Amino acid sequence: MLELKGIHKYYNPGTVNEMCLFQNFNLTIDKGEFVSVVGSNGSGKTSMLNIICGSIPVEGGQILINGSDITKQKEYKRNQRIGRVYQNPAMGTCPTMTILENMSLADNKGKRFGLGRGVNKHRVEYYRELLRPLNLGLEDKMHVKV
């Protein structure tokens, strides 16, 4: 479960350009629930996601995942539990790595790792099957850098 409790977020606080984005904002998303966030440009959709992921700090309130308070956690710590798809695809990939390496990295997110191989050869066909329905030919370009 994801909960936002009493979130307060201001841009440029204490200046003539101060803008209140969220004031006592609350949201609860239960496990397995599918949610669409809809709004006009500048309404705070992306900012809300950035707040949840830790890219933007809040002035007040709590962010809870399964009852655990992550409000003060660093972004990299939250990323162990939160996955996201960026509006700019380049933000969620490593351009010096291949499609296969990027998929493997995402597949292993949150798992323990060592100094072994980064790509599990047993998962390559699985990744191809994930890419095939996109009809972009990416399944044949798995070893091409992003």
PLM regions and their residue ranges:
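Conserved ABC transporter NBD signature motif
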Residues: 61-69, 131, 143
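The feature captures the beta-strand-to-loop junction immediately N-terminal to the Walker
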Residues: 38-40
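Conserved ABC nucleotide-binding domain
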Residues: 130-146
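Conserved structural motif at the start of ABC-family nucleotide-binding domains
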Residues: 2, 22-24
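Helix-to-loop junction immediately C-terminal to a conserved catalytic motif
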Residues: 53
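Q-loop/switch helix immediately C-terminal to the Walker
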Residues: 96-112
